[in-house]
Curated annotation (Swiss-Prot):
It comes from the Bacteria. One of the primary rRNA binding proteins, it binds specifically to the 5'-end of 16S ribosomal RNA. Part of the 30S ribosomal subunit. GO terms for biological process: translation. Belongs to the universal ribosomal protein uS17 family. This is Small ribosomal subunit protein uS17. Gene3D superfamilies: Nucleic acid-binding proteins. It comes from Buchnera aphidicola subsp. Acyrthosiphon kondoi (Acyrthosiphon kondoi symbiotic bacterium). PROSITE patterns: RIBOSOMAL_S17. InterPro entries: NA-bd_OB-fold (IPR012340), Ribosomal_uS17 (IPR000266), Ribosomal_uS17_bact/chlr (IPR019984), Ribosomal_uS17_CS (IPR019979). It holds the Pfam family Ribosomal_S17.
Length: 84
């Protein structure tokens, strides 16, 4: 049996912690009754070893073993730097 490593892309919304960032993942879901597509946001705590991310950056993350109570994702790469 092969395990697939889950990877996601999202936007950095906070980088105030040391070696950690908060990434918001947006997805669209269909409303069960009305059928309208709605945006839903999930916030994930991500391990950033080198503190290389800033707010607004688009990043790629992957799932890993639990690193703390809330962190079980790690940074793969910065896809797009935010223009500030």
């Amino acid at each position: 049996m092969t395990d697939v490593i889950r990877t996601l892309q999202g936007r950095v919304v906070s980088h105030k912690m040391e070696k950690s960032i908060v990434v918001a993942i947006e997805r669209t879901v269909k409303h069960p009754i009305y059928g309208k597509f709605i945006k839903r946001t999930t916030k994930l705590h991500v391990h950033d070893e080198n503190n290389e991310c800033g707010i607004g950056d688009v990043v790629e993350i992957r799932e890993c073993r639990p690193l703390s109570k809330t962190k079980s994702w790690t940074l793969v790469r910065v896809v797009d730097k935010a223009i500030l």
